[in-house]
A protein has these predicted regions:
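Positively charged n-region of N-terminal signal peptides that target proteins for export
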Residues: 1-4
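Bacterial N-terminal signal peptides
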Residues: 7-16
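Active-site bordering "gate/hinge" segments
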Residues: 20-344
Length: 344
């Protein structure tokens, strides 16, 4: 009896710890990315300008889009795409090819990859090689320009490196079930037609649209230091747009936006329709309202507006690349390692 219990318990533990390992091992795209990165890094090490760091980032996107206007369905579709963004750094962390080229490539800054790795492995490998080759050529050109420009420029006060070392990370999420990557298009078409119908037969309303977008991103990241990260990012948005025009010709648009990580957590139609009706009232009031004179002084911002304001006046100013760019304000240039906001 004791042996039987031990055997059953051992089998249970085996089953408990198999799924994660099995899922990661069966993720063919992850394996392809790791193999190609190692191979390309090995080959480029023999070039005149060898990379000191490389990484591959792939975003596999499944999207569902439904839109309606004035109660009529305008669009209903699901699609999938996969893009690759390699990064190749030449030189070293004190001076590399990203000094003047923050994206590390000419436009477009990403390449399309085939979707079916089971039947198109060679095509995926070829696409990775092509984009890596293009990025490397651009990296060499930018690195040579950077060195030449740095030689003739006045020595910079900023000695912060262009690249930071971080610990190696290993993280893997299994793919979401297929039913979690899509929505019922017919159900959402019905909902959006009801929402956008609020604008129908409203005098002076020029636009009355509603749109729902559900996106599931599966993100892959591997680098030459050994980091491997695979994770899922699902998110859903409903957007409502309304617009009118004043007698003097001024266009007056308004919009509503609702966000959730899961479509089932989005507001009900009753809530959105009520908000849309309030939008119609506001649009009608704006159309006949007198012109407001410019104002300079204190202002109170709503929650969403304050978030955007904070992002614009602070968020962009602490971006690393903006600290290195002479064409930017470099507000916090000399505050690396210091608090720029209250700690509490």
């Amino acid at each position: 009896m004791r042996k039987t219990v031990l055997v059953i318990f051992s089998c249970f533990l085996s089953l408990l710890f198999v799924p994660k390992t099995y899922g990661q091992g069966q993720d063919k795209l992850l394996g392809l990315l790791k193999e190609e990165l190692a191979q390309q890094m090995k080959e480029l090490k023999g070039e005149e300008f060898p990379p000191y760091h490389m990484n591959y980032r792939v975003i596999d996107v499944t999207s569902s889009v439904v839109s309606a206007s004035f109660g009529a369905l305008m669009n209903s579709q699901q699609y999938r795409s996969r893009t690759l963004v390699p990064q190749i750094r030449l030189g070293d962390a004190t001076l590399d090819n990203f000094k003047f080229a923050q994206m590390g490539a000419q436009q477009p800054s990403s390449a399309r990859l085939p979707l079916d790795e089971d039947n198109n492995e060679d095509a995926i490998r070829q696409a990775i090689w092509n984009e890596t080759n293009n990025r490397y050529k651009f990296a060499v050109d930018m690195y040579q320009r950077t060195k030449a420009q740095t030689t003739v420029n006045v020595e910079e006060e900023d000695k912060a490196p262009y690249f930071s070392e971080v610990p190696v990370e290993k993280y893997y999420e299994a793919p979401l079930p297929v039913e979690k990557t899509k929505i019922d298009l017919d159900e959402w078409a019905k909902r959006l037609k009801e929402i956008s119908a609020v604008f129908k037969n409203q005098p002076g309303i020029m636009q009355g649209d509603a749109m729902m977008i559900y996106t599931v991103e599966r993100r892959y990241f591997v680098n030459s230091e050994g980091t491997e990260v695979v994770q899922n990012l699902p998110y859903a948005r409903i957007m409502v747009f309304g617009e009118t025009k004043a007698d003097d010709g001024m266009e007056l648009p308004l919009n509503l936006s609702y966000f959730a990580y899961d479509p089932k957590d989005l507001p009900s139609n009753d809530k959105i329709i009520a908000d849309a009706k309030e939008m119609v009232k506001t649009l009608k009031a704006l159309r006949v309202a007198p012109m407001v004179d410019p104002y300079t002084g204190p202002a109170l911002l709503s929650g969403p507006a304050s978030g955007v304001f904070f992002h614009e006046i602070f968020g962009h100013r602490v971006e690393g690349q903006r600290m290195k760019s002479e064409s930017d304000g470099q507000t916090f240039k000399k505050m690396v390692g210091e608090y720029v906001l209250p700690a509490d």
